[in-house]
């Protein structure tokens, strides 16, 4: 799997000469990381299997006007029709950092209107705290995975 260190804000490698780029993965001190407790309630397999997780390719990503948090994604979900998903991750990513990436989405959620735009699904992210600072990492996978590939 490719390193995703270059997609987070503050890790801009686009303008660095190759010689200056650090090819070793960033070391993370996990002793300072806090994660939410696991759910104590179990979900049966039939309920879980109703969620349709798919690989999606980010064709375009723009900031939603008049919103500080929302990004609007135009996604290839393998159906031949663009899918729009809005996500409140602008504090963690700039739109241009995500274009061309392969992400994971739940595609069978009912449309939800946000800022007047229908969001048709949800992108999957990992969230944790380092000290008091919340961190979010959009789940991205190998670009060799085709749009529409189902996750089990």
Predicted regions and their residues:
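Phosphate-backbone binding interfaces of nucleic-acid-interacting proteins
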Residues: 1-152
């Amino acid at each position: 799997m490719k390193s995703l260190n270059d997609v987070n804000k503050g890790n801009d490698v686009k303008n660095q000469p190759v010689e200056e780029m650090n090819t070793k993965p960033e070391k993370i001190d996990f002793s300072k990381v806090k994660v939410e407790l696991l759910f104590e309630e179990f979900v049966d397999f039939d309920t879980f299997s109703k969620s349709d997780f798919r690989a999606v390719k980010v064709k375009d990503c723009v900031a939603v006007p008049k919103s500080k948090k929302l990004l609007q994604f135009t996604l290839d979900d393998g159906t031949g029709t663009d899918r729009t998903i809005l996500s409140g991750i602008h504090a963690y990513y700039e739109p241009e950092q995500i274009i061309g990436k392969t992400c994971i989405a739940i595609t069978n959620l009912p449309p939800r209107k946000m800022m007047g735009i229908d969001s048709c699904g949800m992108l999957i992210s990992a969230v944790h705290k380092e000290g008091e600072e919340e961190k979010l990492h959009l789940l991205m996978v190998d670009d060799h995975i085709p749009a529409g590939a189902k996750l089990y």
